[in-house]
């Protein structure tokens, strides 16, 4: 695993563009809180505003995915150490989907924030770059509920691309948009080890199918 960027998608993605790496800066974070009106903390160590209201949010996760519960607990621990209260909402699979998916909520997503398990296939669907999870108009996913006109224009440019160069340019714009607005945050970038015969080289790596994909048969050569 490796440290992700603000642009969310990992380097193996077609159209990847390097953006600022994520990191922890508690001084900068405290300044952001102050800019938002949170300068004091209560007896429990949580930030409060001028009206005495605690800075808090609910983090939803799927109880059926043990690793996701662990991620949620880690996020809660780190944010509460800093001063933001996190209320964990651990739901069964059906209840989780009903709060986080357009399809299963009948276009009424109600979660504040959630731990999502994005798949390699989902990352590449439609216009790619995890856009189905961000796009509020997507009929199935759309968890981030983004309806921004600039975002939609970028998706259109990606969908209308006729060449790899055109797609890469639009994909770069999307990653810049992710970096600027951060509708979603990657907790880490995963990694894989793919084994192959030493007699061959020039494999094409696919995020979904690994080395065994159609493009490999056009690129592979014997040593």
Task: Place the predicted regions along the sequence by residue.
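Structural transition elements
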Residues: 3-42, 62-70
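Solvent-exposed loop/turn segments at secondary-structure junctions
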Residues: 1-4, 13-16, 63-67, 93-95, ...
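Sec-exported extracytoplasmic/periplasmic mature domains
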Residues: 1-2, 14, 34-39, 76-84, ...
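Periplasmic binding protein-like
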Residues: 80-135
């Amino acid at each position: 695993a490796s440290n992700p960027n603000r642009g969310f998608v990992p380097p193996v993605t077609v159209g990847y563009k390097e953006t600022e790496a994520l990191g922890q800066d508690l001084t900068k974070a405290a300044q952001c809180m102050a800019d938002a009106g949170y300068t004091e903390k209560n007896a429990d160590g949580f930030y409060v505003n001028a009206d005495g209201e605690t800075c808090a949010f609910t983090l939803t996760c799927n109880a059926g995915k043990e690793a996701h519960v662990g991620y949620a607990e880690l996020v809660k621990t780190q944010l509460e150490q800093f001063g933001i209260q996190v209320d964990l909402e651990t739901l069964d699979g059906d209840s989780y989907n009903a709060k986080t998916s357009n399809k299963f909520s009948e276009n009424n997503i109600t979660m504040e924030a959630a731990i999502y398990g994005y798949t390699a296939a989902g990352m590449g669907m439609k216009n790619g770059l995890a856009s189905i999870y961000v796009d509020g108009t997507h009929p199935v996913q759309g968890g981030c509920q983004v309806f921004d006109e600039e975002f939609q224009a970028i998706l259109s440019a990606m969908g209308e691309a006729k060449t790899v160069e055109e797609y890469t340019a639009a994909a770069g714009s999307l990653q810049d948009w992710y970096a600027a607005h951060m509708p979603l945050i990657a907790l880490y970038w995963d990694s894989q080890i793919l084994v192959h015969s030493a007699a061959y080289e020039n494999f094409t790596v696919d995020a979904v199918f690994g080395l065994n994909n159609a493009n490999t048969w056009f690129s592979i050569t014997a040593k």
